[in-house]
């Protein structure tokens, strides 16, 4: 069973993620802030982390940095959940090891298929390809502006 860690300070977002991912037979672990998210990532070893960027205290960027620094968590794929859709924010997420980003508000029904697709590609050894595709996507968007 796929295990997803949702780190978000907003309880309604965590609930939305939980309900939709559990409906697709995924196990969901929740953390309401950065420090508890880091602890749960180390203990639970999730298959993927859905990480909010804008949280009080330890924000999502710093959580991602710490996940990358820890040998136990550096290989866990991160999908950033963010209301910040600017190019530099997306690029920062990719530079911090993120493999995708979902802009809030989002359609919760799209979460489980996204997680499945990303994990399938990672299992096939395409993690670097995922990041490269997102970088290319950002470049295209920047060039069209």
Language model features with spans:
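CheY-like receiver
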Residues: 122-145
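C-terminal output helix
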Residues: 106-115
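Active-site beta3 strand of CheY-like receiver
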Residues: 44-50
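Short, glycine/charged-rich "phosphate-handling" switch motifs in NTP-dependent
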Residues: 99
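Short hydrophobic/Thr-rich beta-strand motif most characteristic of the beta2 strand and flanking loop
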Residues: 25-32, 40
């Amino acid at each position: 069973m796929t295990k997803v860690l949702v780190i978000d300070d907003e309880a309604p977002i965590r609930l939305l993620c939980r309900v939709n991912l559990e409906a697709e037979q995924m196990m969901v672990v929740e953390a309401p802030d950065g420090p508890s998210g880091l602890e749960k990532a180390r203990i639970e070893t999730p298959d993927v982390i859905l990480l909010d960027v804008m949280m009080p205290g330890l924000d999502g960027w710093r959580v991602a940095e710490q996940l990358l620094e820890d040998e136990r968590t550096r290989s866990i794929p991160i999908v950033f959940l963010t209301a910040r859709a600017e190019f530099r924010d997306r690029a920062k997420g990719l530079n911090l090891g993120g493999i995708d980003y979902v802009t809030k508000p989002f359609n919760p029904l799209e979460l489980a298929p996204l997680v499945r697709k990303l994990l399938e590609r990672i299992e096939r050894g395409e993690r670097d390809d995922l990041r490269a595709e997102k970088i290319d996507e950002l470049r295209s968007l920047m060039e069209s502006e």
